[in-house]
A protein has these predicted regions:
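Long, low-complexity, charge-biased intrinsically disordered regions
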Residues: 1-282
Length: 282
């Protein structure tokens, strides 16, 4: 039984933003309705009958599924397989770097799209191909055309003449509310420069599940907040088992983002091919 379904890497999304900014391409957003009902099962799957079919159930009869359903382990894999086959049939190539990335290149015209479960981001310098693809997908699947991209995976996207900014303002506010730190005093930095965390039991162990969930959510936030990436990387080294001082360090990060929740990652439109490199090592 195959249950694996690839997930798009978020750094691919950042490449999308940089590419479309500098080439002046549009970013289109589409959503697939009832995603997992579109998959074709590769194996035979049977389910028990509903209670209304009491007589048939007593006779030992069961239902054979013709399509995938929500709740089946195979559903994500089955859905993605069907979606990928549809794109291959329309002349799209699946990228080796990221299997959720598809592209079509013909006569200097390029169309690129990526998919995350039921969300599709599409960009192109070929309006005709872009609209044709939308029509083809809408014929095969129930689709909702959301127009220009504004939000994707809780990442807010804003575009201007100067470039594209991505942020997670609502995500930050929800995280602060969840941790009851919406009213906390903001910190000036995510971590003190001389912070040295230890694994020695000094303040007692913390709730491992809560600590790991918080760090996981902060890791996701770091995709648009590179300024807190180092601090998050450091506290993520103490997942087994977390201690009191480790949770205090996490709270310090939360206090920092309380005062900076409006920050965003900006992709500026640039001219030329000058490459700038920054490093903190030789």
């Amino acid at each position: 039984m195959k249950i694996f379904a690839p997930i798009v890497k978020l750094n691919i999304g950042r490449v999308f933003f940089s590419l479309t900014t500098n080439l002046d391409w549009t970013l289109q957003h589409m959503n697939v309705k009832n995603t997992f009902l579109n998959g074709n099962l590769e194996e035979e799957v049977y389910i028990n009958l509903l209670l209304i079919f009491d007589k048939e159930s007593k006779d030992g009869k069961v239902c054979k599924l013709r399509k995938s359903l929500y709740g089946l382990k195979q559903s994500p894999h089955a859905w993605f397989n069907r979606f990928a086959k549809s794109l291959h049939y329309q002349g799209y190539t699946q990228a080796n770097l990221d299997h959720m990335l598809f592209y079509k290149h013909k006569n200097e015209k390029v169309t690129i799209l990526t998919v995350y479960v039921d969300d599709i981001i599409l960009t192109s310098n070929d309006k005709g191909e872009r609209e044709r693809l939308k029509e083809k997908l809408a014929l095969e699947f129930k689709m909702k055309d959301l127009g220009s991209l504004h939000i994707f995976l809780e990442i807010e996207v804003a575009r201007s003449r100067e470039g594209i900014s991505i942020s997670q303002r609502k995500y930050v506010l929800d995280l602060l509310k969840e941790t009851s730190m919406i009213g906390c005093k903001p910190a000036n930095t995510p971590m003190d420069p001389n912070t040295k965390l230890s694994t020695k039991l000094a303040q007692g162990p913390m709730n491992k599940g809560r600590y790991n969930r918080l760090v996981g959510k902060l890791i996701y936030l770091s995709h648009t907040r590179s300024d807190i990436a180092f601090a998050i990387s450091y506290v993520s080294q103490f997942m087994h088992p977390p201690l009191g001082e480790h949770m205090e360090a996490v709270h310090k990060i939360l206090r920092d983002i309380k005062g900076t929740f409006g920050r965003s990652l900006f992709f500026r439109k640039t001219m030329g091919n000058n490459i700038e490199v920054y490093t903190n090592a030789d």
